Design a protein with these regions (language model features):
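Active-site beta->alpha loop and helix N-cap motifs at the rims of alpha/beta catalytic domains
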Residues: 1-17, 150, 171-175
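Catalytic alpha/beta core domains of metabolic enzymes, predominantly
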Residues: 3-6, 14-113, 120-123
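Conserved short secondary-structure transition element at the edge of the structured enzyme core
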Residues: 71-74, 113-149
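A generic structural signal for well-ordered alpha-helical segments enriched in polar/charged residues
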Residues: 111-114, 118, 162, 166
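Flexible C-terminal active-site loop/helix
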Residues: 140-174
Length: 175
């Protein structure tokens, strides 16, 4: 990080899942400016955040379904794959999370986010396959996935169509 004059974001993932003490050492590097969680370990992320305070910008990066957990510990930014296909849904997640409306947020997650994330966990790499398929369903360029990833099956394509139809009915998509 010190070799670059650019601001550096630490992206904590399975292979780089830092302890609070390690995070503190990384935060001492002057150009480390942000921390993105990709582990979905809210407990650890909260401990790191409590230890470092406002020294860094904090980003939730484990998925739209993690908005309730991230917002509960004070994170107000997250990466959203749903925003690429249904930006209104992503904005609504943020609005409800920021407002602290847990009941409405959880209902929105259960109705419109959890079904997508359940499908995305069926196979390794399905995060990409599912989103590319939805893009194609919407007439956008999703394109084929690159090996070793695989395309969704026909039955899973039908599941995705049902999810997209639900988003349309809830006015999260203008198609």
């Amino acid at each position: 990080a010190e070799a670059s004059g650019l601001g550096v974001l630490i992206y904590s993932r399975d292979w780089a899942n830092y302890t609070p003490a390690q995070a503190e050492r990384l935060a001492e590097i002057p150009n480390v400016v942000a921390w993105k969680d990709g582990t979905a370990d809210i407990r650890r992320y909260q401990m790191i955040r409590e230890r470092l305070g406002d020294r860094l910008h904090w980003i939730g990066g484990a998925g739209d379904d993690m908005v309730p957990g991230y917002y509960a510990i004070g994170i107000r930014a997250y990466t959203s794959s749903i925003s690429a296909v249904a930006p209104k849904l992503s904005i609504k997640l943020h609005e409800l999370g920021a407002a602290g409306d847990s009941a409405a947020l959880n209902q929105l997650i259960n109705d419109h986010v959890a079904p997508l994330y359940a499908l995305r966990t069926k196979r390794k790499g399905y995060e990409v396959s599912a989103m590319n398929t939805i893009l194609e369903m919407l007439g956008l360029s999703g394109g084929p996935v690159r090996p070793p990833l695989v395309e969704v099956t026909e039955s899973e394509r039908a599941e995705l169509q049902s999810i997209v139809d639900g988003w349309c009915n809830a006015v999260f998509l203008d198609v």
